[in-house]
């Protein structure tokens, strides 16, 4: 859905749920990265060197920020959720198409650390795109996810680590993920119900023109 009618495609709760999901997915990715790093320490050092070489460390420049937060997510969504998943979806069920694009998305990042959490992220992005019915949802999620990782994440790393903080973050991660996914499904349901009412209305064409 590249040219959506807002009344048919979007519901505010869907966007709010995505905002709620971002910190949970970021913290979950951090847990996953830590677990993989414990098993394969050399992967983490290779990843850190790659980020520094690419200019994506704490001293990120403006151009790299724009690329990492806006251009990269938009282009990646068009390629993996827009083209790849859409084409595979014609021949395979959603779960298979989503799995395939997520694997390719992980491989695309060309290092083990990023590849593993990019695979998980790809599954989530594919689900959001499919269930939401629009690639704009996965673009919105991807942009916010990268913004958090680029700006907010490094700021949080400056916090003093304590057992209490660790427990709070862990519990917040669970709440963020459960509520985020649940509210996205609810927002999609409400969006569909509203769209059905609008389609049933005699003057729905005029309403859509006004909404656009």
Predicted features along the sequence, with ranges:
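Juxtamembrane helix-loop-helix connectors linking adjacent transmembrane helices
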Residues: 2-72, 90, 198, 212
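Hydrophobic alpha-helical transmembrane segments
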Residues: 15-20, 62-66, 95-100, 115-116, ...
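Alpha-helical membrane-inserting segments
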Residues: 24-36, 104, 108, 128-132, ...
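Transmembrane alpha-helical segments in integral membrane proteins
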Residues: 69-88, 178-189
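Active-site His/Glu-centered metal-binding helix of metallohydrolases
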Residues: 74-79, 83-84, 107, 111, ...
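Membrane-interface helix/loop boundary segments of multi-pass membrane proteins
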Residues: 75-100, 127-134
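Functionally important transmembrane alpha-helices
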Residues: 102, 114-170
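C-terminal membrane module of polytopic membrane proteins
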Residues: 143-212
